[in-house]
Amino acid sequence: MGVFMEKLKTYLELIRVKNCITASIGGIIGYLISSNFEIDILKSLLVFFVVFFVCAYGNVINDIFDIEIDRINKPSRPLPSGKIKLNEAKKFSAILLILGLVLSLFINIYALIIAVINALFLYLYAKKYKKYKPIGNFIIGYLTGSVFLFGGVAGKNVMPVVILFLCSLLSIWGREIVKDFEDMEGDKKEGVISLPIKYGKKSLYFATFLVVLAVILSPLPYILKIFGIWYLILIAICDILFIYAMALLLKEPNKETASKVSKFLKIIMNIVLLAFIVGAIKL
């Protein structure tokens, strides 16, 4: 029993179980919003576990491609330490992917399509685009936003979740560029290609453009009469904070400001999520 529990603990470490649970909760939030909190327990469980398994697949694939780097930087991780063999990890990733895709079929065809696209992006990001950030940043934005979209397609009212997905994609894509601006020195040493490395401060204008697009889209659930006034009040506060943060960065485009703005943007994004939840429960 002790050996089994130790092995289980190692596999949970490999999949980064906390990250998987966080992603799954995002999927559930998407489902709650699209179903107006009229939930089906079976669908909720399916959404949770599909997101969990596909996310776990991505984390295992990431460690498979990073095994040589992790031998130096993270030698205690399951693969470089030898606690899990490379072939075992490859088989395990295949099992996780199959479980995720098969379970998504029990939701609907849209869920399957999103699961397949996400699995492909997770593979491509781990293999190639982690160090080529002009595309890698988009993938991170898409994958984060798609968690809500995946849960959303399980419900009846998908439009607000589509808007949440787009706002998440754009704002997180922009935030990733801000983070790259902060990390320029380290990225140069590691041979990473990013927009700030190629274009310097000009890249922050593109990041601002992405965030402003998210701001423009954000009132749509109110304009389309999907959500009420409390949503509009919360989202308006978020929009003002978004614009303030990016204006501050454009005024003082340095590493210290980028670090502060990156953290601030993350806080605002959590308030945006709260606004969508408040809108869905008709407060």
From Swiss-Prot:
GO terms for biological process: glycerophospholipid biosynthetic process. It is found in: Cell membrane. Belongs to the UbiA prenyltransferase family. DGGGP synthase subfamily. GO terms for cellular component: plasma membrane. It catalyses: sn-3-O-(geranylgeranyl)glycerol 1-phosphate + (2E,6E,10E)-geranylgeranyl diphosphate = 2,3-bis-O-(geranylgeranyl)-sn-glycerol 1-phosphate + diphosphate. The chain crosses the membrane at residues 21-41, 45-65, 97-117, 135-155, 158-178, 204-224, 226-246, 261-281. It is a multi-pass membrane protein. Keywords: Cell membrane, Lipid biosynthesis, Lipid metabolism, Magnesium, Membrane, Phospholipid biosynthesis, Phospholipid metabolism, Transferase, Transmembrane, Transmembrane helix. Prenyltransferase that catalyzes the transfer of the geranylgeranyl moiety of geranylgeranyl diphosphate (GGPP) to the C2 hydroxyl of (S)-3-O-geranylgeranylglyceryl phosphate (GGGP). This reaction is the second ether-bond-formation step in the biosynthesis of archaeal membrane lipids. Pathway: Membrane lipid metabolism; glycerophospholipid metabolism. PANTHER family: CHLOROPHYLL SYNTHASE, CHLOROPHYLL SYNTHASE, CHLOROPLASTIC. It comes from the Archaea. It holds the Pfam family UbiA. Its EC number is 2.5.1.42. This is Digeranylgeranylglyceryl phosphate synthase. Its cofactor is Mg(2+). One of its GO terms (molecular function) is magnesium ion binding.
